[in-house]
């Protein structure tokens, strides 16, 4: 695992410490990443800034990690002759889809480039674009997957499910204000289900 722990902690996976090798580093640092990738057979690229409030407040950071991250990962794989790459994208690449449920044929789009909200989705689209075209030339296996709102233990309180729970608890019987009609739907996947699905593509 190569991570700078900006949002996480090695303590959250302490039960697996004997089964993994942890290297602290920033994906934007090409030298550190290249060193970490030595003697590696495959790369699973998950490094990103997550959390809607950061899309609005820190769009430059979101894009910086997105663009430098995917470029350094691809160049590091090429340099170290790594032929398998798995890229985590997101349902954010669809924004407001034309149909629900949404399949992989739905067009990818950024509705408004001036809205910082789309720094995340735009970065993910760029990640996919680079993955597809570099993949054709340099990789034997390249897989892009688009998880929707993974949740589970130790996720912290900054994500939508814990925020809903905390807000509901604070209301103490008062009405819960929502946007829309209340009939809107959103996909969520439990971490164990996500890992089971991910194991199928390895």
Regions found by a protein language model. Give the residues of each.
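N-terminal Rossmann-like NAD(P)+-binding domain of SDR-like oxidoreductases, especially those catalyzing
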Residues: 1-150, 172, 192, 198-202
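Short, solvent-exposed loop/turn segments at secondary-structure boundaries
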Residues: 57-58, 154-158
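Terminal helix-turn-helix DNA-binding modules in bacterial transcription factors
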Residues: 168
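Flexible, nucleotide-binding loop/lid elements of kinase catalytic cores
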Residues: 174-176
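Catalytic Tyr-x(3-8)-Lys segment
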Residues: 180-184
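A conserved structural motif in NAD(P)-dependent oxidoreductases
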Residues: 186-193
């Amino acid at each position: 695992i190569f991570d700078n722990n900006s949002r996480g902690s090695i303590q959250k996976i302490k039960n697996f410490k004997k089964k993994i090798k942890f290297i602290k580093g920033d994906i934007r640092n090409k030298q550190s990443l290249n060193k970490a990738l030595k003697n590696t057979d495959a790369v699973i690229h998950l490094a990103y800034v997550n959390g809607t409030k950061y899309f609005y407040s820190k769009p430059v950071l979101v894009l910086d990690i997105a663009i430098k991250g995917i470029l350094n990962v691809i160049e590091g794989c090429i340099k170290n002759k790594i032929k398998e790459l798995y890229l985590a994208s997101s349902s954010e690449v669809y924004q407001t889809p034309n149909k629900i449920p949404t399949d992989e044929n739905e067009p990818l789009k950024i509705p408004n480039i001036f809205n910082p909200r789309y720094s995340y989705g735009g970065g993910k689209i760029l990640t996919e674009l680079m993955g597809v075209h570099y993949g054709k030339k340099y990789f034997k296996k390249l897989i892009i997957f688009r998880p929707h709102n993974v949740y589970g233990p130790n996720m912290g309180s900054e994500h939508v499910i814990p925020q809903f729970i905390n807000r509901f608890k604070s209301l103490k019987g008062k009405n819960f204000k929502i946007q829309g009609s209340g009939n809107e739907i959103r996909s969520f996947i439990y971490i164990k289900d996500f890992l089971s699905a991910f194991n199928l593509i390895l």
